[in-house]
Amino acid sequence: MLMVNYHNRIFRTVSNSENGETSSETEFHYKQIGNIVFAEYFGGSIKYGHLLGLVSEYGTIEMKYHQVNIQGEIMTGTCESIPEILDNGKIRLHESWQWTSGDLSKGKSIVDEQ
């Protein structure tokens, strides 16, 4: 049984590395079936994005993502998200990601459940 269930949860970016494209205007809508998690996201410099990943028994997500930015570019990457349960019971994800397109740089971000 999974310790964390992401189904029907909404997240927003609260911090991101300078080389990232998500911002506080970016909203993620998560769904989960078994240990498969997926989400649509949009807002800020992202017209539309999609992620697909697997959730471990500890709630960590290993995912791939692709998105279209406001410049009309398709950007892709990989991400590991580690959950933290906040005092209010909501989930915070600590993310380590890397572009698989563009400059292939790495970054870190934090997204909070709304």
Each model region followed by its residue ranges:
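Tryptophan-anchored aromatic micro-motifs
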Residues: 2-22, 91-99
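Short, solvent-exposed coil/turn segments at beta-strand boundaries
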Residues: 5-6, 30-36, 55-59, 85-90, ...
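Short beta-strand segments that buttress and anchor functional surface loops
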Residues: 12-16, 38-43, 63-68, 95-99
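Edge beta-strand at a domain terminus
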Residues: 24-27, 98-114
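N-terminal glycine/threonine-rich, aromatic-flanked beta-hairpin/loop signature
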Residues: 27-54
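Ligand-binding pocket scaffold of soluble enzyme catalytic domains
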Residues: 38, 64, 93, 107-109, ...
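A short, polar/proline- and glycine-enriched secondary-structure boundary/capping micro-motif
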Residues: 48-52, 72-78, 102-108
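Mid-chain, well-packed structural core segment of small domains
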Residues: 55-91
